[in-house]
Amino acid sequence: MKHLLRNLWIAALIVCCNFQQAFAQQMPPIPIDKNVRIGKLDNGLTYYIRKNNLPANRADFYIAQKVGSINENDDQRGLAHLLEHLAFNGTDHFKGNSLQDYLQSIGVEYGRNLNAYTSVEKTVYYFTDVPTTRPTAVDSCMLILKDWSNGISLTKEAINDERDVVHNEYRMRIVGQQRMIERSLPKLYQGE
């Protein structure tokens, strides 16, 4: 009887998930804001620019790359995440920590409004709430985005340092997930 109930529960869950997926596919596309200027560069980069006066004299900068863990082979696990970390350790135009130092000098704080993340299908770098009152700030921020797309410094020292950081992040994440799984298993398989 317990097996029958569990199998019925799983079947109901599958039906609900498939219904939700079918419904999601029927949704109309999200309309594009007419105030967004969209273009594509010769190198394939698609850009979106939208003027926003609130807050005044501030800008947000993002670069989303269609590269994530899905692009890795089994022997490359974590490479996309490692590259994300290396982007903050030096680029063609910002050596060492000078990228973070420059952004801090114009009012951008690492962690609060300067960060990045890697997911399965993409890597996104961003810095937000950037004061644009300094005449060269926007140009310098665009140069940072350019460097993040094609100018990350890949020195042996930086790679070795960040490899340890990425491994520790992974271990911390796995330990937390493992604890959640271990707590859930007795409830999922109660009485078996």
Predicted regions and their residues:
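N-terminal hydrophobic alpha-helix used for membrane targeting or insertion
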Residues: 7-10, 31, 70
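Mature N-terminal segment immediately following signal peptide/propeptide cleavage
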Residues: 29-63
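Intrinsically disordered, low-complexity segments enriched in polar/charged residues with Gly/Pro
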Residues: 25-27, 49-50, 101-103
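Bacterial Sec-dependent N-terminal signal peptides
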Residues: 1-25
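Active-site-adjacent, His/Asp/Glu-enriched structural segments that form or flank metal-binding
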Residues: 55-57, 65-190
